[in-house]
């Protein structure tokens, strides 16, 4: 009942505000001009995403004197893990192919109010352990869908309601679409936003409902950014995560489809600094620093081994952790614009009977960083693709610009745990560690990105990981991961 009510209220509010804007425009000589060019500029500002491929001149038509624009992309992604593990890529898959069609429509209803609707048709095909062949899983996925109001009532504040995109520069905090209301404002040098988010329905048609880990979770997201000098900025972040779902009790039987292992009330705060200094023509030094702290409390629900649907224990503990990620990138004044990167990430660690001091990320992150390349890729390596928790990660990278707008990068990662533990948090594959050593291992990624055409994007990744002493008997074993992605925009 909540979703229809919210939609109805939003439509009523939109009708009222649109009518108010129409009246204001009739008497306000400063109202923005209604032109196709203005609509196009607004569309690009509100909908442009780094992880999507779009043409600069999409299909458009005139409706009631305003421009309706339709665009999208077709994408094919394939990834493979070797050797096959008990739990490799995404829930036991050792190979995964995804074919998708994404389409979107943008329409400026008035000079101040705009609508955007995005949807995806997708199909996944996977091979699992033992060469068990699975058929295609087809689904419809809702993407961004929102109503945007610019400087509503002349307040200088923008309002957005619907399924919104949240992301930061390095995806260290956020890279997710959420059902939310967001208010934002600012100037050329300063900007801020405040949002409230809660999932109102399932995001894909092949899901039974809202993800149990997202059910009844309310988030408050705040951000403020200041460009204090040219090419130098500082951003402040805050995220309050409140899980209001009912925590299961010992002995309770819960269907596997609705298992929720964690109910948490957490708050993240932190800052991001970034800048670039031009040393001489075609030579520059880029730097970044991300710092964060998380605190709150969590209830961990444990299920039985022999009765996997029965709750056997509920562990309650405090969460106190911190993390930092810093790096430098030096671009040399040589043919091919070679660049050298050095980065280091560190987190807190330690667990007592009532307090977990290991940092964990927001759960909305993706840890993608461009390292000066044509497109961003996995900050902490593609084979492990782990979450920054109880870790020390040293990174060395070298990259080149090839052709006109493409790139090739070779990146090395060295992984160590802050304290010995028997698991890695949210890694691509599950493998029990000994808990006796901190050396997780090392990884090497080769990443190629081709962007020579406005419409076509090709990405290829070859990654390898060598297990360290923390893997015990598996130390020295190599794991390999490969991925190819093709996107064609329209």
Where would I find each of the regions flagged by the language model?
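Outer-envelope exported proteins of Gram-negative bacteria
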Residues: 71-73, 116-118, 237, 288-290, ...
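C-terminal structural cap/anchor segments
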Residues: 346-439
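Bacterial N-terminal signal peptides
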Residues: 5-14
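Outer-membrane beta-barrel "beta-signal"
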Residues: 478-490
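Surface-exposed loop and membrane-interface regions of Gram-negative outer-membrane beta-barrel proteins
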Residues: 80-99, 107-159, 166-175, 299-317, ...
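Signature for the C-terminal beta-barrel architecture of outer-membrane proteins
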Residues: 153-158, 167-168, 172-354, 401, ...
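Extracytoplasmic loops and strand-loop junctions of Gram-negative outer membrane beta-barrel proteins
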Residues: 53-55, 84-89, 129-130, 164-165, ...
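N-terminal periplasmic/intermembrane-space "pro-region" immediately following the signal or transit peptide
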Residues: 15-93, 104, 108, 340, ...
């Amino acid at each position: 009942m909540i979703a229809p009510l919210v939609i109805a209220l939003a439509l009523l509010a939109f009708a009222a505000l649109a009518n108010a804007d129409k009246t204001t425009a009739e008497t306000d000589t400063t109202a923005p001009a209604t032109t196709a060019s203005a609509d196009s500029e607004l569309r690009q500002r509100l909908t442009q995403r780094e992880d999507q491929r779009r043409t600069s001149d999409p299909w458009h038509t005139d409706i009631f004197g305003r421009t309706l624009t339709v665009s999208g992309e077709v994408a094919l992604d394939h990834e493979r893990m070797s050797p096959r593990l008990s739990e490799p890529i995404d829930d036991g898959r050792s190979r995964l192919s995804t074919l998708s069609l994404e389409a979107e429509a943008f329409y400026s209803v008035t000079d101040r109010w705009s609508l955007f609707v995005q949807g995806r048709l997708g199909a996944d095909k996977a091979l699992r352990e033992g060469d068990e062949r699975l058929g295609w899983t087809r689904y419809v996925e809702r993407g961004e869908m929102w109503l945007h109001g610019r400087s509503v009532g002349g307040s200088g504040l923008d309002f957005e309601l619907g399924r919104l995109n949240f992301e930061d520069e390095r995806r260290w905090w956020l890279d997710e679409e959420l059902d939310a209301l967001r208010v934002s404002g600012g100037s050329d040098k300063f900007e801020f936003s405040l949002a409230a988010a809660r999932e109102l329905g399932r995001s894909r048609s092949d899901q039974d409902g809202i993800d149990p880990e997202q059910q009844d979770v309310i988030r408050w997201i705040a951000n403020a950014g200041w460009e204090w000098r040219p090419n130098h900025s500082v951003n402040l972040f805050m995220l309050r995560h409140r899980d209001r779902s009912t925590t299961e009790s010992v002995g309770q039987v819960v269907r596997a489809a609705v298992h929720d292992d964690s109910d948490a009330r957490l708050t993240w705060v932190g800052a991001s600094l970034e800048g670039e200094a031009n040393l001489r023509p075609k030579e520059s030094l880029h730097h970044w620093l991300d710092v964060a702290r998380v605190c709150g409390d969590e209830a961990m629900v444990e299920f039985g081994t022999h009765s996997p649907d029965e709750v056997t224990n509920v562990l309650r503990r405090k969460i106190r952790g911190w993390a930092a990620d810093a790096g430098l990138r030096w671009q040399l004044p040589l043919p091919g614009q070679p660049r050298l990167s050095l980065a280091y990430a560190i987190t807190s660690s330690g667990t007592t009977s009532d307090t977990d001091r290991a940092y964990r990320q927001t759960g909305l992150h993706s840890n993608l960083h461009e390292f000066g390349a044509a497109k961003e890729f996995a900050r902490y390596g593609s084979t492990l693709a782990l979450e920054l928790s109880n870790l020390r990660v040293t990174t060395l990278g070298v990259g080149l610009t090839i052709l006109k707008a493409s790139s090739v990068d070779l990146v090395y990662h060295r992984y160590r745990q802050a304290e010995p533990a028997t698991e890695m948090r949210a890694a691509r594959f599950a493998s029990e560690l000994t808990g006796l050593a901190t050396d997780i291992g090392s990884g090497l990624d080769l990443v190629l990105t081709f962007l020579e055409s406005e419409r076509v994007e090709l990405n290829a990744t070859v990654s390898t990981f060598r297990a360290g002493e923390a893997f015990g008997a598996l130390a020295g074993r190599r794991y390999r991961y490969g991925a190819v992605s093709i996107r064609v925009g329209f």
